[in-house]
Each structure stands twice: as C-alpha cells, then as structure tokens.
Amino acid sequence: MDRRSSLRLIGGTVAGATLGGIWRGARAARPETRPDILVVVVDDLRWDEFGAGGHPYLKTPNIDRLAREGVSFTRAMHATPLCSPNRACILTGQYTARHCIYNNEDRSLLSHLLPTFPQELQRSGYTTGLVGKWHMGNDPTPRPGFDYWVSFQGQGKILDPELYEDGRLQKVPGYVTDLLTDRALGFIRRQRNSQRPYFLYLAHKAVHPDAIQHNDGSFDLAYGTHYIAAERHRGRYRNEIFPRSQIAKTAEQGALGSVMVQRFLARKNAESTVREFGDILDPGMAEQSIRDRAEMILSVDEGLGAILSELEESGRLGATAIVLTSDNGFFFGEHGLSVERRLPYEESIRNPLLVRFPRAISAGMRVNELVSSIDIAPSILELAGANIGGQIQGASFLPLLAHGAARRVRRSSVLIENYSDDRPFPWVLDADYRAIRTDRQKLIHWIQHPEFDELYDLTTDPREERNVIKEPANHGLVERLRSDLGKLVQHSISL
C-alpha cells in the first residue's frame, strides 16, 4: 500500500457517500451549510470517567447527552498517551515520531511551527479560537491558526490563574474551569451574527492536578500536586467508594503480567524515591484522589451544559459539531500504577471520544472499530469541507458513521508510541516503547528492553494480567504482529 493510500485508507474512495461529502466544496455554497465546530479536550480524563462511560457514582448529564445524542467511539486510542505529545497528535493529525513533540519539556519554539488543522480551517474561511491549555511549552502567546487566543503558561493554575488574553498575561480571580467556560461562551456569542462558521478548541485544565512544571519537564516538588474541585462541588462525593473488584489489591499483583512494570515499581517504591517525591507518587490510587477528580469533572460538565444551552438559545445547536476527547487516561491502581499515564495499558491509552452532530450522526451510535487520536484532525477537516494535506497521517473516521454500503472498516490496528525522558518520573526513564493494538491483541515492544516484550489477549484477559508472549502456541501470532508493527512504524516516520 502506498503512502497516499495508507493515509486515506478508504476515506477517499467513499467521499461522495460519507458525511464529509455533504460539505465538500462548501466554500462556494451558503455559509450556513458549513458546521460550526467545537472541540473540548479534558485533561487526563479516562475513557470511563463519566456517567455514560461507566463511572460508578460520577454524574455528568451534559457529557452523557453527547453520548446519548451522538456517537461513542468505544475503541478510540491515544497515539501517545501523554499530555504534550498527544495534544500535538490531535492538532496535527501526525504521529509523535513525525511532529517531534516527544515529551512534556518546553517545546515552545517548535510548537509555533506545527502544521495544525486550525490553520487550514482558518484558510478555508473559519473564524478560529483557542481557550485553555496549549501545554506544548510554557510560552502562553498565540500560536498560528487562531484568531482568538486565551491560554496560560504550561500547566496553568486551578485557582486565580494567570491568563494570557488581550496581548498580556494577567492574574484573574476565580476557578479556572469556570473562567475558561466564560471565555468560550463569549467567543461563541460573538459569532452569532457572523456569516462565517467558527471553530473553537476548548482545552480544560481539569482534571489534571495543580502542579508547577519547569521547562525541563520536571515538577516543583515543594509545591506538590493537588486536585482542587470548585468550592461548590467539594465534598459532593465524600462518602463514595470506587469499586476495587477489578483492580489488583497490591502493586505486586498488578505487575504480574509485566517485567517492565515490576522494574518501574521497584524503583518507584525505593526509599530514595519515596523520600524525594512524597505524595506525588500515588494520587490515582488514593480513594480521596478519585473522589477529588470526580468533583473536578463536575465543573467541566456544568460548563458544557452552559455551552449547550447557549447554542440551543441561539438556534445553532443542530448546526454545531461537538467533539469531546482527552489527551491521555490515568491509572486508579491498575497494574499497581497511578501517575504513569504514558504506559501502554488500556486505562491510559483508551480515549473517551464522543461526537455530536445531529445533522448527520444518528443518536446513540456506538462505533467499535479502532480509531486513533491522529484521526481527529482529518475528520474535522473533512467535516468542514477543508483541505486535508498530505502531511496528515491520520484518516477521517467519518466513513465509520455512514450507513449501508458506504460504511467501511478503516483499519485493523493502531500504533501507540512513547519516547521517555523522563525528568518528572525517573522510575520510568526507560519506558520507550512502540505497541500495536488490534481488536483482540496488544503487542508491546520495549525499545531498550526487547527481552521483556509483552503480548495480551484482550478478549480473554481484558485487564492485561497475563503476558502470553512466550507461549509456543503464540509464536506465529507474535511474528505477524511484529511485522504489522514494523509497517505502522515505517508509516509513522515516512515523509
């Protein structure tokens, strides 16, 4: 398969029958035929960390509404399950090996040069805005492709943050989720009488804990990390318990399938590491942290509700495509892990991808085919009738939303990769890997330690507790997956 074919897979062959075909050539048509587009990115949100996703006590009626009235992608994956790299994957449609935002170090200069899809939307006639977390460098100034820009330095702060808006950085009193929602609403309201469609990228600080991250990617250990819910939500879930029946009770039990995880945990639990990092080590495993995260998400859900109400009041809800996603998942003790969100296990790589657009998407759809975060960019460009450049490595998922003969299965596997540094968490310093995830299997290749590669049958072992790579019966399967992984890697680095 040549590169152009592999980029598009089947998207181009059914363009006339897919959703994107509705708006192809729309620049010559009436402006209202092109949808307004809202992308909401929730930081660190697990694929199951909202009501409709299966959370046992968190109530998220507005996020659930997107799922109920739109499509849920049940096998969407993060191309690199880590903050900065995956944000670049989402915005460029490229793998990390191509866009080169490898980790959370300060990539300010490089991030000014990224070929992002909002630039193409802007060229095609959209008014574009970014509100919230850029997090590809600590430079808060505007990046190319956005007419409106409100952001902050690096991780930002939860309470009384410094926001860069109107050309300067200034401290603004309030809770960051509410402040970002207010600015998103302001942008949307200013477009009410515009003849141009708009695109808004709303990237929340939540549900990431408060933290200070230096230019080299390391955290300010004296400051620590803190989950802080809006005052009105604190204590809402104080008596709730997250069920642990499907989570290993100890780190040792959780690491049984992986020699690499056992190595990571041995370093993490070393006396010197505990002494240096303190309470940063295990926020995801603490019951209170899981409650605090749930309470933080409540303000995100309320903000989404306010936006939905504004769109309904203006009569634009039906003409607005809304995408909700995250940059990576998180561990609640699975495999004995918590903050090691970059590792290639299901809790971290699965993406809570929802899309609502009633003009073209049937309510309550569930798409079980594999989708990657690099597919978001070409999907939005196709939806907008804009050009999908050859630099984009993802493929539009719109063909998966078509019906009948137009519907196609796009890919049989996805690539997941990580390039570790790692100053924030030195116990995973050698966690560089490339992994292939199919409908049924996952093969993990540890770049520095191939002798510890892993294979899981996700149908019989969904919690990835039994590494079966050395079982003789799997020899042929391992060789096939290695070959397929090699092809994906070749595509990821191709020009």
Which residues are covered by each model-predicted region?
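Formylglycine-dependent sulfatase
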Residues: 2-447, 451-454, 462-483, 487-495
